[in-house]
From Swiss-Prot:
Under oxidizing conditions two disulfide bonds are formed involving the reactive cysteines. Under reducing conditions zinc is bound to the reactive cysteines and the protein is inactive. NCBIfam families: PRK00114.1 (NF001033). This is 33 kDa chaperonin. One of its GO terms (cellular component) is cytoplasm. Its main location: cytoplasm. GO terms for biological process: protein refolding. InterPro entries: Heat_shock_Hsp33 (IPR000397), Heat_shock_Hsp33_C (IPR016154), Heat_shock_Hsp33_N (IPR016153). GO terms for molecular function: protein folding chaperone; unfolded protein binding. Disulfide bonds join 244-246, 277-280. HAMAP family: HslO. The lineage of its organism: Bacteria, Bacillati, Cyanobacteriota, Cyanophyceae, Synechococcales. Redox regulated molecular chaperone. Protects both thermally unfolding and oxidatively damaged proteins from irreversible aggregation. Plays an important role in the bacterial defense system toward oxidative stress. It is found in: Cytoplasm. It comes from the Bacteria.
Amino acid sequence: MADRLVRAMAAGGGIRLVAVTTTETTRMARERHQLSFLASALLGRAMTAGLLLASSMKVAHGRVTLRTQSDGLLKGLSVDAGRDGRVRGYVGNPSLELDLVGDPASFDFKQALGTGYLNVMRDEGQGPPYSSTVELVSGCIGEDVASYLLHSEQTPSAVFVGEHIDSSGIRCSGGVLVQVLPKAAREPALVALLEDRCREITGFSQRLEACQGDLHSLLRDVFPDLDPEVLADEQAEQPVEFFCPCTRERSRGALALLGAEELADMIEKDNGAELTCHFCGEVYRFSGEDLAALIEALPRSA
């Protein structure tokens, strides 16, 4: 089943909810980067969180970037997610495995990420991007992103991300975002109800798997008291996918920036060049002849 994102409201428009499945997206990332199960789980959670954050952007081409800077064995991760539902990402140590595959609930995310910071950058496509950094709270991604929303955007939020991974692979991956909008934040009873409900939620990954991709059902299961209603407009649902815009032509342009002298050195030493996209793992190879042609195409100095 293709991954999807659903937007909903509750409490007369005072509470915003977003749910997303990233099962195929995480599988693609694992295949592209040859990820261990632990690395797959963490990158899947980060891509899920990125899509949830990007879902509220005002412009279709808006993007959110998540990066961790920490001392953990994963050596950091980076995710680029768009309002258009396209997401990509990578981790520093793709082969990291700390726990038995047979017990995915015991994945030690805290040890994998370690202590450090989460940086979130929002780019609306006009003006300078907005960037904010918060300390990692748990390393489980959901609580870390919720901390960012509270401290950097002053929006009380809960972020639930999860997955089910066993020896056969990635069974499911996804998440839910719930936010109290400004007008509802002035209603203490509603805020208290939501806080109590969020504290009571357990076994999110099991709920995610049980819904079998039905995000409407997932929202009703997680927040039955809120009676969430999926938005009626055309933006209520959208597809989600792992996608990277890198191309051979862009790689050629990156090589051209090195200049004729550096390119000539590559021809002499390696008779070519190889560029690998960090975000998707795609490899672009250029022969010595390709580099020579690139040198010829460079503008001559006056």
